UniProtKB/Swiss-Prot annotation:
It comes from Cellvibrio japonicus (strain Ueda107) (Pseudomonas fluorescens subsp. cellulosa). InterPro entries: YcgL-like_sf, YcgL_dom. Residues 3-87 form the YcgL domain. Pfam families: YcgL (PF05166). This is YcgL domain-containing protein CJA_2437.
């Protein structure tokens, strides 16, 4: 099975991406998700096949989600989230004088 997918990046969250089938666009993505995601910024178009490797997502789960729900949400890698949380904690402790 081959799927041409459009991948959008979130302007609100670094490392968060939304995959949709190119022929369907964003039509099946719930409004609530789009609100949380922010205005989608097109990042790339990819041909997805079961043999393809993705850097931060399981291709099988991506294809299954695209077929079932019409979209796949890729969350930021855990280390990126942890690094950002640590940076915010450090900044907050400096601001509060601790």
């Amino acid at each position: 099975m081959k799927i041409i997918a459009e991948i959008y990046r979130s302007p609100k969250e670094e490392g968060m991406y939304l995959y949709v089938k190119k022929e369907e666009g964003l039509g099946r993505v719930p409004e609530e998700l789009l609100t949380l995601f922010g205005k989608p910024q097109q990042a790339m178009v990819l041909l997805l096949t079961p043999e393809k490797k993705l850097a931060n997502a399981d291709i099988g789960k991506v294809i299954e989600s695209l077929n079932d729900k019409g979209y796949y949400l890729q969350l930021p890698p855990r280390d990126l989230v942890d690094a950002e949380a640590k940076r915010i904690r450090t900044l907050n402790s400096k601001l509060s004088g601790h």
